[in-house]
């Protein structure tokens, strides 16, 4: 089992450690509900050092990476980032990732821990013959997610400069206690905040400082409930290698107007012309039962889809779920049933996200 540089500090902070994608990670500290509310109301910090961080370097690196993703990377420049997906030839999703444009010759990508090895091998296979160098920038480093309404203010006090000019999906190099920090205004919670890449020792020091200052340490459990309230996708649940962006609510990432070939383009063009047979929807459960991954979704007693993710929403105080259902049943307001432990529970198709922060 792999350990991040913050493993012992997470245990010291009361973290309950569990296996996750080959790593031993904290699933919770004080408790999921308390951590969830801390991020929604104040500020929380997550150890996400298990995620893959690759640095791609070489002449025209962004143009070469363009052939692997369906999103137009020419829309971003240095200091900006794009959320996108890697596709296979059938248009299925290999992984979702964020592409950070550092310069004309350098791009940083952050990928999921469970897909990191396969993503890295495939990206190398595709890009190294084109003269792109692919390296694991993380290499024992720390990746922290500082999230919540107070996150930006706390980071400003630590680095001694205003971050008001950094837009959502923008990034900047900072210095904290003399140590370089790559800071991106991104996150997986539906709140404002930054994700911070730094060395192991600097990351350990920053973790201690944040906890001493009253920031709540948060685990994978709260990370999942927060992202689900914000209707953010989880790879392996809400999308996978057999699901295209058009089928899982990520069609906005697909820019077919680009006169550029990319892996999976032909399949997506065909789906666009013919339409899709299934769509991802948000469900609000009418009772208190919680729908979980792979629970059947029914209409008039017939199976019409499956739940991809589900939880009890601490903010909304009722169960919510994402589900892949027959396309003709994806209309807002449609009433469906979810089979939960042998009982059919009523649910209604609602607008995503379930929660949207104010301001």
UniProtKB/Swiss-Prot annotation:
Keyword Hydrolase annotated: no
Enzyme Commission identifier(s): 2.1.2.10
A GO cellular component entry from the record: cytosol
PANTHER family: AMINOMETHYLTRANSFERASE, AMINOMETHYLTRANSFERASE, MITOCHONDRIAL
Cysteines paired by S-S bonds: none
Keywords from the UniProt entry: Aminotransferase, Transferase
GO biological process, one term: glycine decarboxylation via glycine cleavage system
Catalysed reactions, semicolon-separated: N(6)-[(R)-S(8)-aminomethyldihydrolipoyl]-L-lysyl-[protein] + (6S)-5,6,7,8-tetrahydrofolate = N(6)-[(R)-dihydrolipoyl]-L-lysyl-[protein] + (6R)-5,10-methylene-5,6,7,8-tetrahydrofolate + NH4(+)
Phylogenetic classification of the source organism: Bacteria, Bacillati, Cyanobacteriota, Cyanophyceae, Synechococcales
UniProt GO MF annotations: aminomethyltransferase activity; transaminase activity
Protein family according to the UniProt entry: Belongs to the GcvT family.
Role noted for this protein: The glycine cleavage system catalyzes the degradation of glycine.
The organism's place on the tree of life at top rank: Bacteria
Residues spanning the signal sequence: none
Organism in which the protein naturally occurs: Synechococcus sp. (strain RCC307)
Name recorded for this polypeptide: Aminomethyltransferase
Subunit structure: The glycine cleavage system is composed of four proteins: P, T, L and H.
């Amino acid at each position: 089992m792999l350990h991040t540089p913050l493993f012992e500090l997470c245990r010291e902070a009361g973290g309950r450690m569990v296996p996750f994608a080959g790593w031993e990670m904290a699933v919770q500290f004080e408790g999921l509900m308390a951590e969830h509310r801390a991020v929604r109301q104040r500020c929380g910090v997550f150890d996400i050092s298990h995620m893959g961080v690759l640095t791609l370097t070489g002449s025209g690196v962004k143009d070469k990476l363009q052939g692997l993703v369906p999103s137009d990377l020419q829309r971003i420049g240095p200091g900006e980032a794009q959320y996108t997906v890697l596709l296979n030839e059938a248009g299925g999703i290999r992984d979702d990732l964020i592409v950070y444009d550092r310069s004309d010759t350098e791009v940083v990508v952050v990928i999921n821990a469970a897909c990191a090895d396969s993503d890295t091998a495939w990206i190398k296979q595709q890009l190294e013959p084109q003269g792109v160098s692919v390296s694991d920038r993380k290499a024992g480093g720390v990746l922290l997610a500082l999230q919540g309404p107070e996150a930006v203010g706390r980071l400003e006090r630590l680095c001694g400069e205003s971050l008001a000019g950094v837009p959502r999906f923008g990034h900047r190099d900072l210095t904290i206690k003399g140590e370089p920090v790559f800071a991106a205004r991104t996150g997986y919670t539906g709140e404002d905040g930054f994700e911070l890449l730094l060395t192991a020792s600097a990351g350990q020091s920053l973790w201690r400082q944040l906890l001493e200052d009253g920031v709540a340490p948060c685990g994978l459990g709260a990370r999942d409930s927060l992202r689900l309230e914000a209707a953010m996708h989880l790879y392996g649940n809400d999308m996978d290698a057999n699901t295209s962006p058009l089928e899982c609510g990520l069609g906005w990432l697909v820019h077919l107007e680009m006169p550029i070939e990319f892996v999976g383009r032909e399949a997506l063009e065909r789906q666009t012309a013919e339409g899709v047979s299934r769509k991802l929807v948000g469900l609000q459960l009418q009772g208190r039962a919680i729908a979980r991954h792979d629970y059947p979704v029914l209409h008039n007693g017939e199976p019409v889809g499956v739940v991809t993710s589900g939880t009890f929403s601490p903010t909304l105080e009722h169960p919510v779920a994402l589900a892949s259902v027959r396309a003709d049943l994806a209309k807002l307001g449609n009433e469906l049933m979810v089979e939960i432990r042998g009982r059919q529970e009523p649910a209604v198709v609602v607008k995503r996200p379930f929660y949207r922060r104010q301001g």
